[in-house]
Amino acid sequence: MKITSIDVFALKPRYMPQAMRGIVCRINTDTELYGYGEAAVSYGKGSMAGFHMIKELAPVILGQDPLRTEWLWERMFMDTFWGQSGGPIFYSAMSAIDIALMDIKGKAFGVPCYQLIGGKQRDRVRAYASQLQLGWPEDEARGLRIAVTPEDYAREAECALKEGYTAIKTDFTCVGPDGRMRDHDTMRGIVPKEMIDTACARLEATRKAVGPDVDIIVECHSHTDALSAVQYAQAIEKYGIYYFEEGTYPLNTDTAKNCARTVNIPMANGERIYTRWRYLPFLQDDSIQVVQPEIANCGGITECRKICDLAHIFDASVQIHVCGSPISLAAALQVEAAIPNFQIHENHVINKFLFTRELGKVDMAAVNGDFLIPEEPGIGQELSEYALQTAYHETVQ
C-alpha cells in the first residue's frame, strides 16, 4: 500500500465560521483505504498557515507505506530541519498527518486505533462541560452566550448539570463586569482587588449552584502570570477547585514551578506545549500535575501516547485538550481509551453545538456527561458530506 495524495480542507461551519475554521487532511492510498487527521489551529490566528504547512509536509510522505507510522513520524521530525524544534503550525500539520496515518492503519487491520496503542482500558470516559463563561446553550444554538454576572455563571453551570455533567470548567476572570473581554495587561502582575473580587463572586455563585460534589476546573488561558495567578489561586482555594489551568505561560518552567509550589491546587497545562521533549522539564520539576496535550498539535496519536507515558512516570494524569472538529474529538477518545493515567475528557462548548457535530459523519455527543469510545476501525470518524461540500479544498499528489 502506498500514499498517493493528500487532500487538505479548511472547514466552514454553518455558524461562527471565522471563529472556528477547522483544518483537516485526508490521506489517500492506492487501495480503497484513506484516513483523516486534524491540525489544531482552528481558533486564534494561524489556521491557514496550518493548512499550507500540511501541503509543505506532504512530499515527505507521498509514495510511502502509510503503515510505517513511526518511521514517517521520524522523517517529518528529522528530515525537515525545522521539525526538531517546531512550533504550533509545524507540529499541528505533523499531528494531522500522523492522525490520518493511524486512521488508515486501524482500518487496514480492522481495529479501532486504541488497539494499536495498547488496547482499551475503558468503554466510556467521564467528561466536563468546558468554557461556561461562553455559555452552555442548547445544542441547536447558533452562537455563544457570554456570562457576566454571578447569576449568569450559576445559570450556565446549572444548564450543564441538567445534561448529566458532574464536572465543569470556567474562566471566571476573562470577562469584565461590563461584559467585555478584559485587556491582557490588566491581568498581569499584582492585579486590582476588583478583578479578584469579581472572579470570586462568580465562582462562589457557581459553587452554590452546583453543590459540593461537582468538580470545578478554573481556566486562566495563560492571561495571568506568575504573580496574578498565585494571587488569584490563593483566593479561590477555599472553593475546592479540581485543578487550575494555564495559570502561567507555557514557556517558563520556573514560573510554573513557583505557582505549583505556592498554591494548594493541582496545576494543569499543555495545549500549547508540543512533543515529549517540551513536556519533560515541566514534569521533572512537578510544575504540572495534569497534562493537557492537544492531540492535534502535540505530534498526533503517536506522540500523544508517548507524552501520556512520560507523564505516568511522574504520577501526572492526563486530560487531552479538545477544541476542534469531530476529527480531533474522535482521535482524542482513542487515546483516552487506552492510557492508564486518564483523568477526564474535555467537552468544549464549541463541540456541543450541532453546527460543529454535523461536520462529522458520526454524531459524537455526550450521554449524561460521558462519551462512549468509538468502536469503528481507525479513529471512528470522517468528514460529513456537508463538511466536504462547504470546505475550501486543495490536493497534493
Could you say what each language-model-derived stretch is?
Residues 1-36, 40-42, 350-357:
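Structured beta-strand/loop patches that form or line metal/cofactor-binding pockets in enzymes
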Residues 55-57, 234-243, 249-370, 374:
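Shared catalytic-loop signature of beta/alpha-barrel
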Residues 3, 32, 57, 97, ...:
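Conserved, mostly hydrophobic/aromatic
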Residues 28-109:
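Metal- or metallocofactor-binding catalytic centers and their adjacent structured scaffolds
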Residues 378-397:
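Extended hydrophobic packing segments that form well-structured cores
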